[in-house]
């Protein structure tokens, strides 16, 4: 995330929670006593973005303080939404728990969901699938934004006959009214 922010140099960063954060929160809920659980935030992103944290290295008996990422970049408004989706201008950014194996099918399902909730959007940017793609349906452009992680180190899909993950990200541009500037928007692959 830090490398991506440095590379793009955005003015604003919105961070949604995703299935990995939900999974970690569920693990803590199962593993910790009720009172201890109250000491922990809902997701690790609360610590990374808002609160900062100490990393305790028990082997070397040291602890290192990591300040909140929102304090690391001067002039960049970084916030954690605490939700699986948010809307900026006329673009919805979402990281649903749902998944469909068809090409861009998860994006289509998400668009149908949001059309029932708030039909005033012209773009939907979807995380979760770790795929890169785009298509237009009517007046809405759907994107799957890829992933910026080290996919070669992620073996949780090994043996599940899934399509390879696609490294990359979406560089999305909007006009002053928050409308998608399609000709300036790019899917970037690594």
Residues covered by each model-derived region:
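Conserved catalytic scaffold of divalent metal-dependent phosphoesterases
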Residues: 2-123, 147
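Conserved beta-sheet core of the metallophosphoesterase superfamily
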Residues: 97-188
